[in-house]
Each structure stands twice: as C-alpha cells, then as structure tokens.
C-alpha cells in the first residue's frame, strides 16, 4: 500500500491496527520534527522492519537525525534530552569533531549512503562542475545593508534568549534580501535594472547560456524573489519563464514539469523555490543550475542541484552558486568551508547554529567589507 503523509494522519486509526511486514518512508525528512502529527503517526505504525529514505537526513539541525533514527531504532540515541546534551549542543553549537565521530559510530551501521560520484553505483552520469559566482553590491544595496547591520547591532546589545535568536534570524533574512535585490527587501515593486550586482550577473550568464541553446534551473529560497526574477527575465529576454513555488497547485505543477522536461518548444528557464522544487522532481533537460541565494545546508542545496544532476542526464551539469563578496554570504561560506569535515560528517546545519554565536562573532559576520561595493 502507498500512502501520503497526509493520508497517514487521516487513516491512522485503521493503519496502526495492521501488522505490516515493513514500513518505508520516502523523503523521511518529513518526520524531522517528532512533535508533528505526521511524525507521531509514522512512529505508531507496527512493522517487522522500517526503512527511511532521504537525501537530507539533517535539514535544519542535527536534531533532525534524532527523530529519523528514533523511528528506525527507538532508543538508539537516547531520549531527546540525552541526545541534546550528548550530541546536539557539542555538534550544533560547539562544532566538536569528537562528538561527530561518536555519533557516526552509533548511526553508521544503520546507514547506507549512495553518492552520485561513486562510479561503482552510477557509471554513466556525466561530470558536474560547481563554481562560486562572486558579485558586488550596488551603492544602494551597500547603504541598505549598513542600515540593517546598525539596527541589528543595537538590538543585540539588549536581547536575550529566544528574543535574541529571533533578532539573529531576522537579520540574516534581511541581509540576504538586500544582497538579492533592494526591491525584495523594500517590497515596493520598484524598478529592477541597475540596482543589484547579483541580478546583473545572472542576466549576463543567462544570456550566454541561452545563446548556446542550454536550459537552466534557478533556485531561490524566497518566493517573492522568484517573482522578481521571473518578471525581469521575461522582460529582458522576451520569452516565457516558468516559476514553481509552494502556492502552485499540484496539477499545474505537474504540467510545468512535463512542459520543461518533455516539450521541444518549452521555456528554457525554470525558477523554483528551494522548498517547493528542491526535491522529488526530474528535470534533467537542464544542464545549468543557479543558486541565486544560498541555503546554508549543503545537503539541501545538493538535493536541489540533483533535480538536474541525476540518472538520465546526458550532459555536463554546471552549478553556479551566487555570493556577494564582503558580506555575510561570503563569510558564512568561508566558515562552512573551514569546517567542511564536520559539515560533511553530519550534514551541515541550516542557519540555526548561527544563533549560538556570541555578539562579537555576529558583528564580525554581519560587518560589510570594503570590497563588497562595486567600483
């Protein structure tokens, strides 16, 4: 029997009475929060064996792994409180490699990991080229960025606990919006040209790509930025651009994917929100993947890239990761690169770990370096 997570919740009264031979969860990150109804429903099912399939076992924090392992092997990682003390805090906040090693020793025997780069598993997948695209801010972006940092610095001086975490996460979101485009940050539907270094560079690269007859996926974590990109790219190149986001009905979503993947006259550009389009789609007709803004969990980004870099792809895939030089985007990227072994070991967390940094460390990350502004 095949069921969605929504139907599992609805029909749990019937399904939990069945002595299943096995229960297999696809996209198992859907049970990352043990308090949700769908997570509790999955844990209730009785089966001789359980399997969880996921490309992002740690989507937001290492705590996600506890919920999945608790479904597979109850008690293996202790209670939530024990896990937090033994692994979550040392890994998430302190980036302790010894804690990562201990967690691997416990979970490793129960994990089968397939890498697309392993030629023993997939022999005919073409190469993937990843490159960082460094962009500068316009003067307008620089002024807005400085204003957000000043506001955050004052707020952090007095904020504590949950309020402080809220300030940090809100500031991260605001600064990333500024780096994307002032119109996104201001939300004023203002003109787009000549105001964003990122957008200008994207247009240049898309122009070259279209001239070569290539197709591209463009990922953003912000639905409003997706709308901005769609409008600007359609106006600039005079051709339809698809945009898939969380508000697109399933039927329309299927039509968009089918058009892009199978129709010769379909649009060459497909914008997708990271959450709505980052998993479960086969879009191998694209051979370019643009990450317009970065999600600070490598596994989530890789999942999105794999919409194009997967079995069935016949061309080399070029992955372009946009960063604004001299801003928090570059600094966080540098931190992740320095701790790549830990990030790869337990799949780097999202942005929640940044809330654990000291105020001095946050000021250093938020600060705008001189090289950020265009000459």
Language model features by range: what are they?
Residues 1-95, 104-375:
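ASCE P-loop NTPase motor core, strongest for the SF2 helicase catalytic module
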